[in-house]
Amino acid sequence: KCSPSGAICSGFGPPEQCCSGACVPHPILRIFVCQ
């Protein structure tokens, strides 16, 4: 099961956790989100 775009993800986790395969830093909030 993968996370959709915009879902919070771990910046240190495997990129496969996101459906897009990319976990990127949020521009405002200090979190990582799926691209």
From Swiss-Prot:
<feature type="disulfide bond">
    <location>
        <begin position="18"/>
        <end position="34"/>
    </location>
</feature>
<comment type="similarity">
    <text>Belongs to the Mirabilis serine proteinase inhibitor family.</text>
</comment>
<keyword id="KW-0722">Serine protease inhibitor</keyword>
<feature type="site" description="Reactive bond for trypsin">
    <location>
        <begin position="30"/>
        <end position="31"/>
    </location>
</feature>
<comment type="function">
    <text>Trypsin inhibitor.</text>
</comment>
<dbReference type="InterPro" id="IPR040875">
    <property type="entry name" value="Tryp_inh"/>
</dbReference>
<keyword id="KW-1015">Disulfide bond</keyword>
<feature type="disulfide bond">
    <location>
        <begin position="9"/>
        <end position="23"/>
    </location>
</feature>
<feature type="disulfide bond">
    <location>
        <begin position="2"/>
        <end position="19"/>
    </location>
</feature>
<dbReference type="Pfam" id="PF17983">
    <property type="entry name" value="Tryp_inh"/>
</dbReference>
<protein>
    <recommendedName>
        <fullName>Trypsin inhibitor 1</fullName>
    </recommendedName>
</protein>
<dbReference type="GO" id="GO:0004867">
    <property type="term" value="F:serine-type endopeptidase inhibitor activity"/>
</dbReference>
<keyword id="KW-0960">Knottin</keyword>
<keyword id="KW-0646">Protease inhibitor</keyword>
